[in-house]
């Protein structure tokens, strides 16, 4: 399965090193939907490129799209294609049968309240020790699937193409359109 990650990229970093496409930034985690940094690190990926870029641009709704929005910590944002081994299993939170088995409600999965989603993720991580991660729908577009990959699945990941994001990148334009972000001239 090919997934996508939008991340701050250091071109000279190894894939699994700090600011590489397969780096699990556990030391900086704690605010994200499924973060539990005392137990695991995770990567936030998506089934389509636009979904992960939308996640990066969401904080800038109502602003003009400028090149500074495409930088984090002085590094350019990049889009990486990441292959998850076909043998990997995901806990699919978009599957009604899974929600029933796990005694989860869709509203609790979709909430932005981290006091709800982080304990859910920790429980799933512990109950499914062979799961590579979690799959759920994007809060920006329900047809987009987001995937949280746990660090225990790092060996199941391979990096494909990496593109530095620019204002004229087609995926940036598509993602900016979701929020009505307009290019500064």
Model-predicted segments: where are they?
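Active-site and NAD+-binding cores of ADP-ribose-processing enzymes
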Residues: 1-32, 63-185
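Extended catalytic/binding region for NAD+/ADP-ribose chemistry, centered on the ART fold
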Residues: 33-64
């Amino acid at each position: 399965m090919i997934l996508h990650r939008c991340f701050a990229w250091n071109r000279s970093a190894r894939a699994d090193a700090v600011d590489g496409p397969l780096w699990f930034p556990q030391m900086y985690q704690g605010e994200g939907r499924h973060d539990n940094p005392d137990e695991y690190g995770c990567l936030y990926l998506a089934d389509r490129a636009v979904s992960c870029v939308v996640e990066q641009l969401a904080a800038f709704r109502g602003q003009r799209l400028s090149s500074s929005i495409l930088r984090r910590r002085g590094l350019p944002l990049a889009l990486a294609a990441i292959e998850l081994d076909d043998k990997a299993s995901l806990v699919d939170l978009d599957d009604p049968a899974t929600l029933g088995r796990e005694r989860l409600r869709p509203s609790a999965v979709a909430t932005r309240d981290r006091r709800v989603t982080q304990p859910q993720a920790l429980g799933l991580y512990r109950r499914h020790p062979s799961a590579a991660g979690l799959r759920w729908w994007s809060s920006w577009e329900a047809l987009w699937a987001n995937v949280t990959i746990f660090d225990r699945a790092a060996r199941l990941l391979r990096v494909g193409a990496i593109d530095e994001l620019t204002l004229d990148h087609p995926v940036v334009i598509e993602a900016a359109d979701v929020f009505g972000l307009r290019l500064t001239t």
